[in-house]
């Protein structure tokens, strides 16, 4: 309840630290509250087992115990909801937690930690450490106190953390980089498909691990989809996230803006046609703003199809057959999220089963919700956050073989 009551404060923190529009910040606060509510109910569903023993004079009991202190390492792009996932799951499992936010977003996470304490969480149960990321992460992972690590970050950082955690055989949950395909079949409603693409792609200006980053449109619908997508994207308002009607804020850092500009130039050099954007917007002398950019004449060999854009860049490609697009979409080392637009239930099921990602959104832009397990496969990591599966990663399994005769 306190998260919802303080959603305006939390949204302002995210607007100031990330550049996120206020409406998106409020939505993130609502999603964070949902996650706390879900995990508060999960405490009732940590079921043990009584197993029939093969011996008549013994009994077998299986139960769960808290794993211990958790180190939660969170990124800057969704500082509130990603911290909420880790903190609420740890609390539900009976674990204390030390949160290390990104150096860009300590204020947002500090506000959440204060809300936990204000809600009655005992002192020392939810803690925050902010500062130099490599130093703090190394100290946490090398500590004998830490029994579990939960990381949301890049695949590069995940591999480094995993190597360090291996020394102590610490349990690790990792949600890492993504490169999400957005597939539009020829039976899809193009009006709805473009709305879905806008909502999924431009959340946090594309600085999202589940943001669609390669658009595959079946041949007969490509022209109509691209034209309508360009038309709708033009109408998005860019500006200061603190302004109520803004839909797209800036890139969060100068480094992020520079990387986007370099990738755009690389894509153009490789032969892509810019249909929209491709530059900083006029009238913005300050800030790290960049226009939503839509490319055509892109092939699967382009750099942008291999490197996670993590920004408002949209390469458009075409395909002929179902088997072809699934094969092309799966031809990547990352596997976090994918999006499918189709009016065929049979095609929706086949695509969901065959595409190699941990989460699939069919005819909806929503991927991560409180009641479902969120995470990836391949080099996107392992373990899940959300749903009924997440809490098991914060628990140890123990069984007792009990003799009942003296």
Segment roles from a protein language model:
Residues 13-21, 51-57, 177, 243-249:
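Short linear capping/connector segments at secondary-structure termini
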Residues 1-8, 22-46:
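Long amphipathic alpha-helix in the N-terminal Rossmann-like dinucleotide-binding domain
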Residues 36, 86, 112, 161, ...:
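Aromatic/hydrophobic pocket-lining residues that form π-stacking "cages" and hydrophobic walls in ligand
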Residues 146, 183, 237, 264, ...:
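Conserved C-terminal structural/oligomerization subdomain of aldehyde/semialdehyde dehydrogenase
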Residues 123, 176-178, 208-210, 244-245, ...:
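Short glycine-enriched loop/turn motifs at secondary-structure junctions
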Residues 14, 36, 94, 126, ...:
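Residue-level signal for inorganic ion chemistry
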